[in-house]
Each structure stands twice: as structure tokens, then as C-alpha cells.
Amino acid sequence: MHILRFSDLCAQGQARGQRVFIRADLNVPQDDAGRITEDTRIRASVPCIQMALEAGAAVMVTSHLGRPTEGEFKPEDSLAPVAQRLSELLGREVPLVADWVDGVQVAPGQVVLLENCRVNKGEKKNNPELAKKMAQLCDIYVNDAFGTAHRAEGTTYGIAEYAKVACAGPLLAAEIDAIQTALANPKRPLVAIVAGSKVSTKLTILQSLSKNVDGLVVGGGIANTFMLAAGLPIGKSLAEPDLVNEAKAVIAAMAARGAEVPIPTDVVVAKAFAADAPATVKKASEVAEDDLILDIGPETAAKLAAQLKAAGTIVWNGPVGVFEFDQFAGGTKAIAQAIAESSAFSIAGGGDTLAAIAKYGIEKDVGYISTGGGAFLEVLEGKTLPAFEILQKRAAG
């Protein structure tokens, strides 16, 4: 995928004295008092901003925060807490600028934060008039927000159409590289883990991956539907019986390519979904009518771990059990440890997956951890993300 990279422009001295507009993803969670509860995204945006400042650029940064009503600014929509945290991380004051669409004053070597871009009328619908105005603010547009790469909005797509130069920041470029390594030119065998509560939310991902991967591991409620498709009892477990035919089709598509969807041979069950519910390991064929399947069993986990250790590339989206409760965490822990020990290139994404990676302390052993959420899922579906598409188009001239 050919795109212009901001790091290359900086290295060539092309950013010196230029006005640089960075679209970052600073959409962080806040408590009721507006305090930031988790600042990973702000920290992840710092390298791009530092790069621009060190290159001698006049730097403007913006992001969305929450879901404001376009055209109506409310105090709770303000990026003020983000500006404060960014100031601390950069060791310099980061002024917050409101009503910025018609002009921004910023000198080379300075950085300003432009107020919540989703307050601007026309941002979400990618209004061309707004996009042209924003493009006039800068010499170089930098997209460094993978989390919104799947949305064609004013600050993620429109501005890139009209800016003099449009390029990818280091965070977005790293995502593109990792995705290319994992999906476009994977070292085989390529094994994907797709878990979650519902087949319906990830059906297109399962269908897309079944055409490309050598092993497709399903977990969580998704695995229960696949167990039904394999004729196994699942008791009162979460499943979607109306999607059994779709699950069978995915199994058949994999089998036609000589690949497989491993169905659990043993499971961990309980009579209730609770933190203190006693756990019992059972053969998959012996699940009782009042059982809830809440994890894969140790035999299944060991088989999957062996498969992951032998893989060339691993894509991980979703924990395979209710890992928040320790008695149902064995499967997810075994998979996390196998990925950590595997020599495969691994890419992981999705909120619950990131929580599992943090719980088992394997951050340093995962090849690439995607910050994307919805954007990561759309990549797995085989879609070209709008942000990638426009940057490729601009790079091609």
C-alpha cells in the first residue's frame, strides 16, 4: 500500500516552517466530573506531535471527543482536559483554540489543540465546503487516527482530498504496516482467533477470514453457535441457533481449502453466570441442559496453544472465555501465553482483547497491538478503509 509518510517528509526537511494539521484520536474515556480515566490514546498521539515540532513546523492538532451535537458546543464536549494532559506529556503549554475553521494563528515551533472537530457543522457528513476550509488552514495534512480510519468524515477524508499534501502519521503508518504483514503477505500458517458473544456481529469477518486463513479459532458465544452446528449440546449457553447454517457454511469453506475450524472437545461450565459460580470441566458431548459454557476446557486450550505456537502469523480478536472471572479465564490465559511464546508475527485488537493482554502482561510479546476497535474489525472484514483509500489516491498523484 503506497502512501506518503509524515516521517519521510520530516526527514527530508519538508515540514520546516510549514503549517501542519494533525488529525489525532484523542477520544478518551472520562468520569462524570470530566476527568480522563484512561489516557492511552493521548500518549499514543505524542510521537507524531513531537516529530512535527522537532521538524520546525507550526502544529495544529484536533480530534473528536464523545458524541457532540453538530453546531452546538457544550462544556462537556470540550477537549480542555485533553489539552491539559497533552501539556503535561509534551512539557509545554498546549493552548486550546475554539471556533477555528476560519483561521488559526500558530507559529513554527508552537502547537495548538483545535477544539472538538465533531462540533463543526458538516464534519460527520464530510461536507466539501467545510473540508476545503480546513484544508486551507495547512500546508501538510497528517492523519494519525487509526481509530476513525473507517469513517469518511471531514477531518479524516475530506480535508485529505483538498490539502496541498496528505500523509500518514507514525501511528497510522504502523497500523498499515502491521495489517499488510498480517493479512496481505502473511507468513503461513495464518491462524485467526475470532471470539465474542455473537456470530451476527462478526459474521462478515468469519466469512472473509475463512477465504484466507489456515486455522480459524472461534471462542465465546460464537463458539457455542459453532458447537450447535457440529451437533453438540450447549445447554442454556448463549448462542444464535438461527445462524447455525452460516456457521456450517464457514466450516465448509475452510474444509474446502484443507483448513479447519477447531471445535472444542472439552468446556468449562457453571449453573449460573456469576463471579462466585463453581466451575466444572466437561467433555463437549456431555454438557447438561442447565449448563452454561463459560470457557474452553484445558484439553482444547492445550491443542489451540500448540497450533498457535506452530503458526507463522496470528490475528487475535476476542477472549475465548469469561476471563473477568478467574475460574473461567484458563482458556484465554493459555491462548495469551501461547501467543507470547510463539515466534509468529501477531496482531491483536478490540477492547476486550486489549484488556486480556494487559491482564496477562504480554504487551511486549505481541507483534502489534491495534488501537482501532471498529476500524480493526473492518480491516478483518477485508474492507478498504476510507482513510487508507484517500491517502493512497493522493500519494498516486
Curated annotation (Swiss-Prot):
PROSITE patterns from the xrefs? PGLYCERATE_KINASE (PS00111)
Pfam families membership: PGK (PF00162)
Q: Where in the cell is it found?
A: Cytoplasm
Main location group: cytoplasm
The record's disulfide annotation reads none
Catalysed reaction per UniProt?
Answer: (2R)-3-phosphoglycerate + ATP = (2R)-3-phospho-glyceroyl phosphate + ADP
What InterPro entries would the database entry show? Phosphoglycerate_kinase (IPR001576), Phosphoglycerate_kinase_CS (IPR015911), Phosphoglycerate_kinase_N (IPR015824), Phosphoglycerate_kinase_sf (IPR036043)
Residues annotated to bind substrate: 25-27, 41, 64-67, 118, 151
Q: What Gene3D superfamilies does the annotation carry?
A: Phosphoglycerate kinase, N-terminal domain (3.40.50.1260)
The entry describes its oligomerization and partners as: Monomer.
Q: What is the protein's name according to its record?
A: Phosphoglycerate kinase
Its gene is pgk
